[in-house]
Amino acid sequence: MNAAKSEHIILISPVGDLSTELIEAIAGEIQRVFGFASAIDSILQDLSFARDHNRNQHHSTMILDQLAANAPARAIRVIAIAQVDLFIPILTHVYGEAQLGGTACIVSTFRLNEGRSGMNISRKYIDRIVKEAIHELGHTFNLRHCPEATCIMHYCRNEEDVDRKSDELCRYCKVMLEDEIIRINK
């Protein structure tokens, strides 16, 4: 991966109590895949503004808007890791959502960790959450869903799809990411 400018960071914003092991795993993959250092800072703690009481879920797009608005200037991207069940109006649930080519994305541990708390987490679930975190961050770097089933940018309908895909970008997506990072570093 091309060396990123040192002043650029990707901010990891945990919402609630999440395991240190999970956050460190996400930070390590951010460095490996995107070449950017990460920082950890909880910029949103209360997600009640996005709660839909009829669905008993949180509207992820509303959270993205707040994340982007509250991201510090030094963060070129911000990813929230939350434990709430997320949705967008056209789908019953989502594992995460991102602003395509934008600043913010979010991943929920809720369905990927089968409703367990963010502190009680196995390696299998850490791997799932990390894959989806990298997937959502990929969207912020203008990567679209990939038809290659093993690419980390492949769209997943269920947990088995997440388990099946690798933690790597396919050759095409890797080139697209490298081009985007060159553009950012100009």
Map each language-model feature to its residues.
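The catalytic-center signature of Zn2+-dependent metalloproteases
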Residues: 115-186
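Metzincin-family zinc-dependent endopeptidase catalytic domain
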Residues: 16-133, 144
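Short boundary motifs at domain starts and secondary-structure transition points
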Residues: 1-5
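Generic structural signal for residues positioned in beta-strands
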Residues: 11, 78-80, 105-106, 152, ...
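Fold-level signature of zinc-dependent metallopeptidase catalytic domains
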Residues: 6-18
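A structure-centric signal for secondary-structure junctions around beta-strands
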Residues: 6-9, 75, 101, 167
